[in-house]
């Protein structure tokens, strides 16, 4: 699996046509996932309950797609175990993120939640056993500098936000585990099958947590929840899951940084949250990084 991923990245991401479509799918998946925070804010249920409905509404469609994809064949026991483990990581990630975002500033939650990007980049370097050089190194620098500009202005360190900050950080760590497990299981499972199994595991965990926290479960307005299931779970996670085995954790980590940039734009459009010149420049830096990471690169120096 690792050898396959490394060879793809070294050859500019795969055969040209497949590589382009796979990278576009990875970006489109992250853009769809970016809308999730906006829709969670619009939902009239509790935060964990909205995550439950995201899964529950999407699940019948995911299972139908998985059945069609697999022809009704039962996956291997090992694949089911790995996909189920990914589902546990993802459910706990959603719980930590949705609760944490209510106990800290949005900028803090976004900053700490996106530690998954840094962790995936570090893991990608560890797997390759080589330091990034050339365009790849510049892309990493631009991506994280741009994200710091996007989130740094509104970030605030305070004891009042400690619990929320720690929960958001935990969410980022859990999401890293989810991505790596899904990337692993995609070596043996098709995308909808892997996503369907992980989603089945998520549903009872999220419902049980929402009930334990005494959240409002039943919505009055279904529109935000239906859109959340469509954009974040079916489209966003569907595209992400399909593209995962085609790229290294390093590339996947960098594309995750699209999410805070798009979230800032969505906040401006939906809630009138101001975007200053620094925010715009930070978004442009992230965009430039995504272009550079696809350019041919010199062979990196061994670690």
Where do the PLM segments sit?
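Glycine-/small-residue-enriched transmembrane alpha-helix faces in small-molecule transporters
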Residues: 2-52, 85-88, 96, 157-184, ...
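C-terminal-most transmembrane helix of multi-pass membrane proteins
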Residues: 3-12, 54-55, 153, 221, ...
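Loop-to-transmembrane-helix transition segments
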Residues: 21-31, 53, 72-96, 138-141, ...
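Transmembrane alpha-helical segments that form core, pore/gating elements
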Residues: 38-39, 62, 120-126, 140, ...
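Specific alpha-helical transmembrane segments that line the substrate/conduction pathway
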Residues: 49-60, 98-131, 136, 171, ...
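Hydrophobic transmembrane alpha-helices of multi-pass small-molecule transport proteins
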Residues: 62, 66, 84, 90, ...
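Loop-to-transmembrane alpha-helix entry segments
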Residues: 77, 81, 110-113, 129-149, ...
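Helix-helix packing/entry segments at the starts of transmembrane helices
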Residues: 109-115, 181-202, 233-269
């Amino acid at each position: 699996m690792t050898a396959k991923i490394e060879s793809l990245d070294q050859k500019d991401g795969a055969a040209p046509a497949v590589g382009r479509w796979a990278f576009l799918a990875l970006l489109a998946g992250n853009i769809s996932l970016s809308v999730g925070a906006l829709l969670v804010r619009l939902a009239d249920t509790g935060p964990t309950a909205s995550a439950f409905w995201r899964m529950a509404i999407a699940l019948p469609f995911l299972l139908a797609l998985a059945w069609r994809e697999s022809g009704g064949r039962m996956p291997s026991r090992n694949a089911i175990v790995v996909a189920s483990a990914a589902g546990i990581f993802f459910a706990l990630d959603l719980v930590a993120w949705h609760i944490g975002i209510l106990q800290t500033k949005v900028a803090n939650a976004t900053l700490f939640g996106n530690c998954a990007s840094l962790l995936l980049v570090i893991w990608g370097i560890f797997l390759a056993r080589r330091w990034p050089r050339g365009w790849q190194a510049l892309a990493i620098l631009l991506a994280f500098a741009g994200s710091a500009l996007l989130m740094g202005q509104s970030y605030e360190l305070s004891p009042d936000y400690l619990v929320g900050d720690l929960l958001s950080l935990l969410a980022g760590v859990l999401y890293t585990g989810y991505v790596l497990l899904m990337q692993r299981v995609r070596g043996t499972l098709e995308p909808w099958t892997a996503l369907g199994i992980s989603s089945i595991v998520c549903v009872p965990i999220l419902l049980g947590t929402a009930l334990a926290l005494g959240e409002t479960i039943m919505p009055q307005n279904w529109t935000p929840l239906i859109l959340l299931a469509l954009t974040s779970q079916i489209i966003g996670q569907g595209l992400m899951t399909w593209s995962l085995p085609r790229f290294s954790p390093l590339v996947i980590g960098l594309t995750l940084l699209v999410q805070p940039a798009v979230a800032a734009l969505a906040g401006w459009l939906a809630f009138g949250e101001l975007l200053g010149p620094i925010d715009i420049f930070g978004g442009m830096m992230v965009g430039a990084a995504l272009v550079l990471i696809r350019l041919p690169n010199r062979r990196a120096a061994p670690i």
